[in-house]
């Protein structure tokens, strides 16, 4: 858990810059159904992005300094685990948020949804979230991600929205987030890197098979 929090402390400042730069003028209310749907859709998008890739496609790097699909996928999975541990092991165990704490989280949903997936600004992942060739195939990675995301979706489904909104924690340069917002952040982060996978696949030198 401590390692997850430390990794978050490194990852979030850079992502928050993107969120602030791309935030819409007004936030719209979000409910439990929206959260579950967003988690489910970003899960489907990730699984689709790596489905059926050959070993050559899985390991292809557009350039020496750029990540392969395998490396991006591993980063997504490592991050999913980190966010999940932070939400269930820390955020939801904090004391009930005060009215002042809740007030500070108002309007952050659309900043997360619009800013985090935007890849205009690109940043280096913290060391703990750097890929290390953990998954030999796309199928293996898909199974690992699905298991973790299924658990996070189950948490979103079984935890009342009022409970998700009642627990607030950091670290986040956007300000502390409630558990609902942390879940949105997690899904938006996956969406950001699915776009990165699509960039790799779109490279002219990407293997045909």
Question: Residue spans of the language-model regions?
Answer:
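Amphipathic, well-ordered alpha-helical segments in soluble domains
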Residues: 42-49, 79, 83, 119-123, ...
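Short, contiguous alpha-helical
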Residues: 60, 64-108, 150, 157-158, ...
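Positively charged n-region of N-terminal signal peptides that target proteins for export
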Residues: 1-4
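N-terminal secretory signal peptides
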Residues: 30-78
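Bacterial N-terminal signal peptides
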Residues: 7-16
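Domain-scale detector for complete catalytic domains at protein termini or as standalone homologs
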Residues: 14, 33-36, 40, 120-123, ...
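Hydrophobic packing residues in well-ordered alpha-helices of helical domains and bundles
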Residues: 35, 39, 138-145, 183-186
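Short, helix-capping/interhelical loops that line the mouth of catalytic, cofactor-
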Residues: 19-34, 85-143, 171-177, 204-209
């Amino acid at each position: 858990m401590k390692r997850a929090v430390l990794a978050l402390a490194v990852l979030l400042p850079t992502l928050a810059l993107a969120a602030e730069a791309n935030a819409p003028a007004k936030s719209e209310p979000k409910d439990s159904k929206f959260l579950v749907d967003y988690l489910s859709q970003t899960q489907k998008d990730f699984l689709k992005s790596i489905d059926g890739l050959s070993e050559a496609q899985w390991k292809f790097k557009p350039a020496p300094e750029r990540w392969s699909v395998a490396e991006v996928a591993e980063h997504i999975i490592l991050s999913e685990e980190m966010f999940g541990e932070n939400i269930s092991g820390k955020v939801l165990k904090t004391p009930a948020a005060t009215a002042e704490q809740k007030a500070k989280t108002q309007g952050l949903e659309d900043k997360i949804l619009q800013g985090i997936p935007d890849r205009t600004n690109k940043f280096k992942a913290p060391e703990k979230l750097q890929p290390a060739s953990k998954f030999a195939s796309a199928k293996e990675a898909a199974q690992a991600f699905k298991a973790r995301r299924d658990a996070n979706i189950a948490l979103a489904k079984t935890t009342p929205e009022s409970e998700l909104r009642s627990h607030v924690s950091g670290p986040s340069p956007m300000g502390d987030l409630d558990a609902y917002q942390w879940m949105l952040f997690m899904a938006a982060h996956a969406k950001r890197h699915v776009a990165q996978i699509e960039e790799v696949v779109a490279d002219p030198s990407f293997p045909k098979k």
